[in-house]
Amino acid sequence: MYADNLYAYGPVDGPLTEDLPAQAATRKGQVRTLMAERLLAAHRLGTLQVAIGRSSDYYGPGGANSVVGDVLFGAAAEGKRARWLGRLDVPHSLNYLPDVARALVTLGARSEALGEVWHLPAAEPLTGRAFVGLIAAALGRPVKVTATSRLALRVAGVFDPRARESAEMLYQWERPFVLDASKFQRAFGPLEPTPHRQAVATTVAWFRERAGHTHC
């Protein structure tokens, strides 16, 4: 079972489906494409049994290193200014980590999943502004947020390799980025994703507890 992301597709217009060609426009996307192609080739040869589950950017308890982890949830939990990549006004699919785990377990238990790529179910895509609003509601106070621009990431990338990598993937956050998991739902569903409001509240609680331990 290979847990993958959506980097392989590159910039696309419309929802992301499994039948899109691999047209990665970035180094990270090209690496992911090569890994997936090699795994599927090994499956066809009978060397391995492989199924690939792809999710969008993730969040949830334990997700500090996510692109919306420490810089968004962590900062908000500590009362600091949070950062959102790209535009705040375009919809973006985000997968909740426990839902990703459930879906991967499902794929691992079903022989018909083998040899295929599957998109893992996520709750409805939200704009950055709406997502930050859910964090604020869970915290019970406003959250100050800055939309991080391409220019800002390029400047920061002179000193910070992580900022350079974020700049490379920023196209996902500058236009609608919508995951289509209907293939998974037709084959194995219904698997109902956790509603964002509930998932965000659980994630905020985890980051709050973590911040408390950090400052002890």
Predicted regions and their residues:
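Conserved Rossmann-fold NAD(P)-dependent oxidoreductase catalytic core, especially the SDR/UDP-sugar
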Residues: 1-31, 43, 51
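Conserved sequence/active-site signature of Rossmann-fold short-chain dehydrogenase/reductase
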Residues: 8, 58-60, 100
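Short-chain dehydrogenase/reductase
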Residues: 14, 18-21, 25-37, 66-70, ...
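A structural motif corresponding to the C-terminal end of an alpha-helix
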Residues: 35-49
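NAD(P)-dependent short-chain dehydrogenase/reductase
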Residues: 45, 49-52, 56-91
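Substrate-positioning beta->alpha
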Residues: 64-71, 85-108, 115-117
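Alpha-helical membrane-targeting segments
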Residues: 71-93, 144-177
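Mid/C-terminal beta-alpha module of Rossmann-like enzyme folds, strongest
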Residues: 103-165, 181, 186, 194-216
